[in-house]
Amino acid sequence: MSKATKYDPKKVERQFYQIWETRGYFETDGNKKIQNGKTFCIMMPPPNVTGRLHIGHALTFTLQDIMVRYKRMDGYETLWQPGTDHAGIATQNVVEKQLLSKGIKKEEIGREKFLEYVWKWKEESGNAIVTQLRLLGVSPAWSRERFTMDKGLKNAVREAFVNLYYEGLIVKGNYMINWCTHDGALSDIEVEYEEKEGALYHIKYPIVGSDEYLVVATTRPETYFGDTAVMVNPNDERYKHLIGKKVRLPLINREIPIIADEHVDMEFGTGAVKVTPAHDPNDYEVGKRHNLPFITIFDENGILNEEAGEFAGIERLEARKKVVEKLEQEGFIEKIEPHKHQVGHCYRCGNVVEPYISPQWFVKAEIAKEAVKKANEGETKFYPPQWLNNFNAWMRELRDWCISRQLWWGHRIPVWYCRACGHEWASKKEHEESCPKCGSTDIYQDPDVLDTWFSSALWPFSTLGWGNGDWGKGVKWFEDDLKKFYPNDLLITGFDILFFWVARMMMMGEHFLHKLPFKDVYLHALVRDEHGQKMSKSRGNVIDPIDTIEEYSADALRFTLAALAVQGRDIRLSKERLELYRNFTNKLYNAARFLQIHQEKFDDLQNIQIKTDLGKYILSRFGLAIQEVRNNLNSYRFNDAATTLYRFLWGEFCDWGIELSKVNKDAIAELGAIFKESMKLLHPFMPFITEFLYQELSGTSIEENESIMIQPYPKAAPIDEEIMKRFETIIDAIVSIRRAKALIDMANKTIPKVLIKGDLEESAKAYISKLAKVETIEFVSEPAENAVTDIGNYVEVFIPLEGIDLTPILNRLNKQKEKLQKEIDKLSRMLSNENFVKNAPQAVVEQNRAALAEAQNRLATIEEELARLTR
């Protein structure tokens, strides 16, 4: 083994990964020698081709890889299905910007030419995130990698759409939708709401046939050109006499009725509400209830149309200022007051979203009924379980899903129209030649594309061959894949896409295959900085996973994320944690170096007999660790599994096993075999260093030996309760002696004698003497007089004070006592001052009270020590 005192991950990570992938270990038959007939399937949430690996990705893929490596080593035929998403809006935006930088507008070159540019960009730049994933050490079946717009998945998308179309579950109609003037139609969950400081404009609407006017309050005065009624509550005494009359819209003089509706909140604004059915979702419903006209006042780009009179041709938000100015000039503004309200923004570009009536394609909400029913029957289990409640709450409010997007890049909606006879039909073919009804060739395809999430919703089964036709058969998927791997065993993803993606996969999977697509769904929380702040470029607290791998290693990053992944809690990631687990890799490396000083290579644990008591003790501790790690992984408690591994390898094996073996060198061969086996237990979390140390301790190299990743995962080792109790008592004695020595400033010195009261055998003396630095150990049955005492869990220890010069110790304690007494006096005076307690900030007062209590406790401890040493 290298003489270097630190492990160098850069020397092994890329080399090992290339060997693993080249040998096919990531494929479903990569572990065929140990397969037991069970299967395990997990889907990679397909990252966007525009994406770069961020820390949230690193968490998702680390947790997935831990489960995949665990199941693979445990004999399962394992499929981790990789792939990327075409990311409609994001990808089109990237390519549009590139072309604009060259002076090219997509409209000038047309759809087909533009799509050629997109495909070219995808081939050249769209796999950056896949390259970055390899640096993390993940092990999906790369040979099966899919792309949401590969030919097979295009076939599957058409299959799904056409079936839903003819079942009446996909329909087209004029709906009130969320409209981004940059990115087009958005589904409800693609709109992000932020509280904004705005204004509430009180506008005077003249009452027809009267000198009076009705005041309405609105946050969007530019939309009043689309008003078709003013609405009041029928129980509002202020306005009862006006119901049925009309008002005249300022500036444009169009008359609209005053109507009554119990939905009006009499407390909001003036209690009179403008009704704009074409530009407000609530007004849309009012318009339908009262048969009001629907007047659209701006186009797809947010430009006001002729309905706005002199303001036609002005962008909507710019028009707001001009409309208000004009209304003020004409005396139609009663007042403007500050008003906080929720404003919807496009999740992709940040534009203010407008409610807008537009002909769009929708998936009807009824498709979700069976999926919700089966989820609540337990067909899918959520981890943490409270996410089922969130799922149910969202599904109760589910509306029809708008799936059409006004883009060029994406799955083209497979609906065709005949200009000759007006026939409309959906087709599973990529191209149609003629109308099936009249035979005319004057046909055209719907220009819109599908929401990216539509193809993603098919991911758990389309990647397994469903609807693919023959494309990719025998390469990307095989005849029995769907039967073998559907439903998938597990999905791991962030909670933030539960509704974007997870719920929709459940709808589609249940509808087409009559089973929910996952047995278990694990939803992890957000990765935040060490202070719990969300990471953002503006805050300067972003932790880049690629930079982190470069500085700390992939293993350190993976283990840190796993150790912090408590179910239901956000992860607070810090450099201190990363350093801690980088130090862990060095601790493991140096443990192996120590073992190899005594013996160059070690047998497999299964091939040796453990004879020494120390070997039996460490094997028993290892057996308990195996049980805990397996139980925790099986219930997705990644943090608990990582904590167990860290505690066993550092706290038990390195801190005690190795140190105790310096007394009993006969145990080193046994400890080496246990340590080598423990690398298998750790491997799913830290694949690189475990491979390195496993090969080193085997006396070979990965070039000439099979990888650790296809070795059987450790099963329970024998646990000897009697041996464990014996060594726990020895360790307790050592720790107690060290504490007692520290009290008399002799922590690092050898002392002549210690008396121990407890259940210990003669063989324990050698261990205690060596590790506690004591010349003579004597077992006693009664407490000793004139001695420093420490009481442990199983023993009491006594260090006789005879012959020990206590003067320096007493001087130190008396100085500490004097200093603490002054501090207590000062704090007591401050807190007894009524003016201070009354006028100082409450937090400062509480801080001083806590400081006083702490100082008093420390003084009591020192006085106890002085009393003990001067008895």
UniProtKB/Swiss-Prot annotation:
It comes from the Bacteria. One of its GO terms (molecular function) is valine-tRNA ligase activity. It catalyses: tRNA(Val) + L-valine + ATP = L-valyl-tRNA(Val) + AMP + diphosphate. A motif ('HIGH' region) lies at residues 47-57. GO terms for biological process: valyl-tRNA aminoacylation. A motif ('KMSKS' region) lies at residues 534-538. GO terms for cellular component: cytosol. InterPro entries: aa-tRNA-synth_I_CS, aa-tRNA-synth_Ia, Anticodon_Ia_Val, M/V/L/I-tRNA-synth_anticd-bd, Rossmann-like_a/b/a_fold, tRNA-bd_arm, tRNAsynth_Ia_anticodon-bd, Val-tRNA_synth_C_sf. It is found in: Cytoplasm. ValRS has two distinct active sites: one for aminoacylation and one for editing. The misactivated threonine is translocated from the active site to the editing site. The C-terminal coiled-coil domain is crucial for aminoacylation activity. Catalyzes the attachment of valine to tRNA(Val). As ValRS can inadvertently accommodate and process structurally similar amino acids such as threonine, to avoid such errors, it has a 'posttransfer' editing activity that hydrolyzes mischarged Thr-tRNA(Val) in a tRNA-dependent manner. Belongs to the class-I aminoacyl-tRNA synthetase family. ValS type 1 subfamily. This is Valine--tRNA ligase.
